[in-house]
Structure formats: C-alpha cells, structure tokens
C-alpha cells in the first residue's frame, strides 16, 4: 500500500493534491496519511493472529495527537519514555493500561504519576531504577508491575546512534546482572514481575539479529523459570526498518511467525514506531532560489535542518520528488539546502530534478523522527502538520508564529531601585 502517489503528473496524499494542501496550509508542511498509519499498524496486529500480543506503538517516532488518536481508535498500546508522552497518549484517547514505560532516567515524579494512572508495565533499565520504582511503590502502598530490560549484546547493521543492544550502550542490564535483579524483584512486596524486555536498535532490515536476541532472551527466561520466576510476557522491542532508498525490508508476517515459533504461550509485546508512521508522512518544502555556481547546483528551499534533522544528524537519505512535473524548469543535479547558517543544513544531496523558483519538493518517508526532532534553531517557527483521510484533511498542529518563539521568555531587569 502506498497512499502517496502521482496522478496526472502531480503528487497526491490519498485523494488530495499536495499542491492544494500547500496552498491552504503554507510551506514548509508535514503531511500524514491516516489510512497508511492504520494499514501499517494492522499489518503487525494481524500477523499475530490469535496469539496473545500487544502492539505498543513507540510514541517517540511521532507524538502528534492526531497520529496517536488514529492508533488509539485501533486499540493500540503505546511505548512511552517520559510522562509527557504518557499524558499525550491519554489526551489522544489511549489507555494507560496498555502503555509500557521505557527509558533509562525515570524520575520519582514520573514513576508516581505512572502508577497513579495505572500503566501496564515499567521496563526497568538498571539496578538503581529498580530500587527507585520499589521505593515509590512502597510509599504509595502498592505494587509496581515491572519487566527488566536485558541487553542481549547483539550487533546490528544500522547507524551507531540508533544501535541499542550492545554492552557499550547505555540501555538495559547484562544477562548475568539481570538474574539477581529478577530474584530481588520476585521477593519484593512492592514489585510484580510481569516479563522480560529487550530492544536492539532501530532501522534494522534483516531478521537474523532479532532472532539472535530472542533466543538469548528465551534462554534467560528458562533459567528464571528454573529459579521459580515465571514470565507472563516477552517484550521484543521495535526496530523494524523501512525503505528510504529502495532497501530490502523485513517481511512482517514472516518475522512475526518466526517469533511465534519460539515463544510458546508467552504473550508478545512489540514496539514498532518507524514502521508504523515512517512511510505515512512526507515533508514538503518550497524552492526559494536556484543557485548554480559551476561547481555545485543548489536549490535553496524554505525547509531546513531544524525542520527535518535526519539528513544532517545521521546522514540519512530521503527520496526527493518534485510535487508537480515542470517541463519549464531547469534540469540539473541539485543539493537541497535550507536557510540555516550551517554548512550542514541540507535535506538532500546530488538529486536529479527539474525545478524552478516556487516549485514544491517532497521529502518522502518523513513521518518518523521528523517533526519530533525539530527545533527553533535560528529563531525559526516550527512548521504545521496536516492529516489526510481520503478526500478530507485537517490541521493537526498549528504553525508556530514568530511571537510564539519568545512568549515564555522575559528580560532580566538588574536596575537598582
């Protein structure tokens, strides 16, 4: 399924011309496809069949309330890493009882609030965190549901910034250390052991590292069972990649089946983020100037690295497409560069496009880690976000104004009265 397609030489989002959206909502603009989000989530959900499972969408990938609401209506669970994300889920109609709380630095306030709201489970990432969760639960005269995030020490072929399953990474605890933590939790009056969690990284396009991690986790679960500690679920994390540049991606159905073949009766929790929203969003920007220096040709656009950080942060590739065919434009190999005062401010390099001033260019598969990583660098207002459903569309985030940039700031007055 691909809900962004060309009709009569113009790019459409579902049944709406992207140019029409740009004229109504302005540039730059994030555009999301409701049906693509739903279809991606259903692909994971249906792959499990009748096996007990919970698809917990990773909120960090795209936390817009409009996106979360689409998933909440489908019955999705959510993987959250802050109390702000949990409150967003609830505001969007999601259920806290279907949320797992991940992250390495949960504060006492966050733990208390999560217990008050009744989350499904804490994914505990260290011995110190286990002590803190137990302490807060004791003060509240309750039991905290926990799993322990185990670091399986599995290497993956992805950017080092988003590899999370090696011993040198900050996430989780070693298999050896986890045994003593599980024993402590099992005998605590204020902790309730629910399961085991791991997450090995993001944008992974092969099944083998997932299965290697799963086998290590299941071996640990067997050891724990021999000690009288039983698990009700295994949380296999997220990390399934998408095709940014025609990469071969994982077959979801085959991946899930390979998991089900090994887990027995254990409930499976899965935390996809990018795979749910990545190809369900595009970032559209307008050409302000064309500049051909003889060495390089630059299409200077109104979108920038503060709007879509992935290219400058990770060296990531997004397909760049002219929104409408323009035979009057200049055909060249362009770098798409923005107005930020940094040489690293680019969204694409060496792309063969036919462009003229005023044209719109779409950066494809920008639905994940797009707006959520944006900033106000160079005092630039953050852009608007729009959701499309068939022929309908609506603003799901207003564009910031220049005035909103400093409405929470004040001038320090050091005059002596």
What residue ranges belong to the model's regions?
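A charged N-terminal "starter" segment
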Residues: 1-144, 188-192, 223-226, 391-417
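Electropositive phosphate-/nucleotide-binding environments in soluble metabolic enzymes
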Residues: 12-15, 31-38, 61, 65, ...
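Charged (often Lys/Glu-rich) extended helix/loop segments that serve as interaction or gating elements
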Residues: 22, 258, 265-417
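Conserved, mostly hydrophobic/aromatic
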Residues: 37, 60, 82, 114, ...
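Active-site-proximal loop/turn and secondary-structure-junction residues that shape catalytic pockets
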Residues: 61-63, 84-85, 105-106, 126-128, ...
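Solvent-exposed alpha-helices and their adjacent loops that cap or buttress functional pockets
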Residues: 91-94, 116, 138-142, 161-163, ...
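Active-site loop/helix belt of alpha/beta enzymes
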Residues: 152-289, 347, 378-380
């Amino acid at each position: 399924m691909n809900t962004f397609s060309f009709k009569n030489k113009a790019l459409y989002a579902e049944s709406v011309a992207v140019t029409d959206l740009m004229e109504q909502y302005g540039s730059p603009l994030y555009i999301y496809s409701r049906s693509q989000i739903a279809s991606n989530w259903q692909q994971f959900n249906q792959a499990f069949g009748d096996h007990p499972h919970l698809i917990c969408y990773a909120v960090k990938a795209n936390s817009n309330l409009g996106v979360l609401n689409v998933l909440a209506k489908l019955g999705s669970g959510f993987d959250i890493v802050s109390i702000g994300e949990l409150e967003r889920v609830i505001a969007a109609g999601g259920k806290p009882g279907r949320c797992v709380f991940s992250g390495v630095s949960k504060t006492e306030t966050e733990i208390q609030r999560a217990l008050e709201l009744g989350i499904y489970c804490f994914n505990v990432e260290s011995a110190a965190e286990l002590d803190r969760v137990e302490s807060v639960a004791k003060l509240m005269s309750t039991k905290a549901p926990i799993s322990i995030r185990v670091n399986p020490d599995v290497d993956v072929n992805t950017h080092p910034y988003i590899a999370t399953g090696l011993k040198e990474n900050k996430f989780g605890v070693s298999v050896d250390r986890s045994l003593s933590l599980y024993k402590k939790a099992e005998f605590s009056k204020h902790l309730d052991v629910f399961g085991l969690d791991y997450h090995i990284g993001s944008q992974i396009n092969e099944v083998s590292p997932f299965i290697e991690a799963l086998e290590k986790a299941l071996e640990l679960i067997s050891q724990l069972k021999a000690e009288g500690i039983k698990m009700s679920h295994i949380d296999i994390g997220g990390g399934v990649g998408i095709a940014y540049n025609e990469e071969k991606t994982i077959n979801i159905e085959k991946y899930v089946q390979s998991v089900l073949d090994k887990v027995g009766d254990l409930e499976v929790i899965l935390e996809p983020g990018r795979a749910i929203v990545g190809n369900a969003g595009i970032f559209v920007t307008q050409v302000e100037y064309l500049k051909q220096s003889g060495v390089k040709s630059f299409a200077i656009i109104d979108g920038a690295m503060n709007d879509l950080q992935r290219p400058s942060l990770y060296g990531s590739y997004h397909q760049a497409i002219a929104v409408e065919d323009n035979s009057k434009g200049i055909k060249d190999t362009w770098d798409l560069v923005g107005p930020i005062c940094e040489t690293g401010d680019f969204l694409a390099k060496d792309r063969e496009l036919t462009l003229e001033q005023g044209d719109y260019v779409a950066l494809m598969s920008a639905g994940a880690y797009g707006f959520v990583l944006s900033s106000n660098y160079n005092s630039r207002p953050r852009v608007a976000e729009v959701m499309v459903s068939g022929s309908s569309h609506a603003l799901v985030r207003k564009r910031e104004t220049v005035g909103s940039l400093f409405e929470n700031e004040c001038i320090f007055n050091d005059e002596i009265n």
